[in-house]
Every structure is written in structure tokens, then in C-alpha cells.
Regions:
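Binuclear metal-ion centers of metallo-dependent hydrolases, dominated by the metallo-beta-lactamase
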Residues: 261-365
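Binuclear metal-dependent hydrolase catalytic cores
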Residues: 1-252, 258-263, 324-364
Length: 365
């Protein structure tokens, strides 16, 4: 009887946030799109009546958070007349994750003169698509979509790095950063041996938006105020949790952590002081009590939940040695001390009331 409807069938961790917008249309924001994102869409988006996404927020640059990026094209609004995405999906991340995405998914950062995002297009063949290419130039592209350079060996573009810039030989496109968050650039190599060869492909139409780093300064997604929560994911790696919701109805999501950083500790201390309160707390729990260098376990997360005193807590990211029902029977004993904490299950729907309506979240464990 074991199968995807069984609570022990677990995909990569993520949550889908659904909330009412004043314009009357519901918004859908996904936190993390890991290796099993496509499965989650087929199973749980359909079950919860979700057809498209408005935005994606990424916690970090590991495979379990970003390797489903290619499948975002399947959850974008489609214009049958133009055969292109009708809208651009916003993607919020830190700079490191953005740089990793450029290397892992260079085709999701298309050059306007070469490819058009969100639909089929023709343009100059790219060096990465040409096994015989030995003469390449660089096309520099701003994240906002404006071209800053010209094609292969062109007058306005650097030829083989001669005019400087961030290059990496024949490898994947390098990433460079200017002084402004709005001026991240990607360097694309254009094919020099067949400049008129057509490119035809359909890729997701995405807008890349870095959020404030190592601080809890908020950013806004269609009226939903989101606070980044920097945490350690191992001794030397910073990942991000996220917090949102109004006073007394906070939601805190910490999917990959070993320790909280000072800025996060300070904000959560304010959110646990009356009249404020955490309504829902989602915490990492790789194992029951075994130590891990990069993840919290159940014992660590129970201790944090006791300190933050949420109305409800869910554990995610469990290894497959957990038996869902048996573990939750043990955890229910903590209700005697006023702590409601359980293992989450894939597709679980949690309703959280907010000042402006309701947020419904589907949790993948």
C-alpha cells in the first residue's frame, strides 16, 4: 500500500503560499523548487487547484532547493496567441544562489539579441550549443533584460576577454556583479563560426530579484511582507529561512539550519514577545537524535520550538527511517506541556489567518 498518498512518501522540502490579494485574484508563492518539484506540481498543485505561480523564493543554492527551476515554465500563464508565457515569474534569492543558477541553468538567463524568454525564438547560435566553436565573443546582459554588449567579436563586446570582465574560458557563463543589486550581469559566449544559425527553444520567463542578505530587512511579494531569516546550514554556509504574517499571526519557516544567526535571533525574540506570537513554525528535522553537520534533528528543533512557543509546529526534511504515524504518536505526548508539534506530510494544507485574509500553505516534507 506504500505510495505517494502514504505520509512516508516524501519529496524535497518546500511550501506553497496562497493568499488573497486586494485585486481579487489569489497569489501563489513557492518557497524552493527542488529535485522533486515536478512531482509536487503533478500531485499537489492539482489537488489544491493551483495552476500557476506568481513568484518563487529560494532558501539556498543546493540541489534540493533549485533543481526544479526548469519546470517553472509548466506553471506560468500561457498566451495561446503568441505561444509564449503571458507573465514573468519573479524569483527571489541571495547573490550566491543567483550566481549558481546562472551556471547551472544558463538558458534561463537568455540574451535578448539571441533568445527570447518565455517562448520560441530565433537568434544567433550560442557557443555552448556549438561543439566546433573555437572563435567566441561575449554578450553581456543585465538581469533586467537590457543588452550591455554586442555579439561575437563585435565592436561593443569584448573578444575572448581582451577588454576585461569576468570570463571563464570555454566553461559555463561566468557571473559578475556591479555596485547595484539591479545590475547583476551574465556573460554569454556567442558562436563565432556560425553566427547566423537559428536558436529555437522555449524557456521559462523569469525575473531575478536579489533580497537583502544577512539581515532580516523585509521585501514584498504582491503585498505579502517577507523577512529573510539568515541561519547557518553547517559551520560555514548561510542559508535562509523566511518569516511573514501580521502581529500575533507570524509564520516562521526554517527548512535547512543548524543554528540561528544573531539577526534572526533578534527578530524571533521580538515575534515571541506579547502581544506578538508565532502562529506556525516549520523546522528542519533530519533525524531523531543523531547529530548532523548540516541539519537540525528532532531534539534540536523541539528545543527551539519550546523557546519560540508557536501555536503549532511542523517538522520537515526527515530521513526515510522515520515512520510518520509512529513518530507523531511520540510527539503528541508533548501536548501535555502545551507544545503542538508533528511531522509534516507532503501536500499537507495549513490555514493561517492574516489581517488581510487568509494564507493557505501546502507543505512538502
Amino acid at each position: 500500500r506504500y505510495g505517494w498518498r502514504d505520509p512516508n512518501w516524501r519529496g524535497n522540502v518546500g511550501i506553497l503560499i496562497r493568499f488573497a490579494h486586494p485585486d481579487g485574484r489569489q497569489r501563489h508563492v513557492q518557497i524552493d523548487v527542488g529535485k522533486t518539484f515536478r512531482e509536487a506540481v503533478l500531485r499537489w498543485y492539482t489537488a489544491h487547484g493551483v495552476g500557476t505561480l506568481d513568484a518563487v523564493i529560494l532558501t539556498h543554492d543546493h540541489a534540493d532547493a533549485i533543481f526544479g527551476m526548469d519546470d517553472l515554465r509548466s506553471v506560468q500563464r500561457w498566451d495561446p496567441k503568441t505561444k509564449m508565457s503571458a507573465e514573468t515569474t519573479r524569483v527571489y534569492s541571495d547573490r550566491r544562489t543567483l550566481a549558481t543558477l546562472r551556471k547551472a541553468f544558463p538558458y534561463l538567463f537568455p540574451t535578448p539579441a539571441v533568445e527570447r524568454p518565455g517562448g520560441f525564438a530565433e537568434g544567433r547560435k550560442l557557443a555552448r550549443d556549438c561543439p566546433d566553436c573555437s572563435s567566441v565573443g561575449e554578450v553581456t546582459v543585465a538581469v533586467n533584460g537590457s543588452a550591455n554588449g554586442a555579439g561575437a567579436n563585435g565592436a561593443n563586446g569584448a573578444s575572448n576577454g581582451a577588454n576585461g570582465g569576468a570570463t571563464n574560458g570555454g566553461g559555463p557563463p561566468a557571473a559578475a556583479r556591479s555596485d547595484s543589486l539591479e545590475k547583476f550581469v551574465a556573460l554569454e559566449q556567442a558562436c563565432g563560426c556560425a553566427p547566423t544559425s537559428p536558436v529555437q527553444r522555449y524557456v521559462a520567463s523569469l525575473q531575478w530579484l536579489p533580497f537583502p542578505e544577512e539581515t532580516t530587512a523585509p521585501f514584498e511579494v504582491d503585498g505579502l511582507v517577507v523577512h529573510p531569516l539568515p541561519v547557518l546550514h553547517g559551520k560555514d554556509y548561510v542559508s535562509y529561512g523566511f518569516g511573514f504574517g501580521g502581529e500575533g499571526r507570524r509564520v516562521v519557516y526554517l527548512s535547512d539550519y543548524t543554528a540561528l544567526l544573531p539577526a534572526t535571533e533578534a527578530l524571533l525574540a521580538r515575534w515571541t514577545a506579547a502581544p506578538d506570537a508565532i502562529d506556525l513554525l516549520v523546522l528542519d528535522a533530519l533525524s531523531w537524535d543523531k547529530p548532523s553537520p548540516v541539519h537540525a534533528n528532532v531534539e534540536i528543533s523541539i528545543a527551539l520550538a519550546r523557546r519560540l512557543a508557536p501555536r503549532k509546529a511542523l517538522l520537515v526534511g526527515m530521513g526515510h527511517d522515520f515512520e510518520h504515524r509512529a513518530a507523531n504518536r511520540v510527539l503528541r505526548r508533548l501536548r501535555a506541556e502545551g507544545l503542538d508539534i508533528q511531522l509534516a506530510r507532503d501536500g499537507e494544507l495549513v490555514e493561517v489567518p492574516l489581517a488581510a485574509g487568509e494564507v493557505c500553505m501546502s507543505v512538502d516534507s
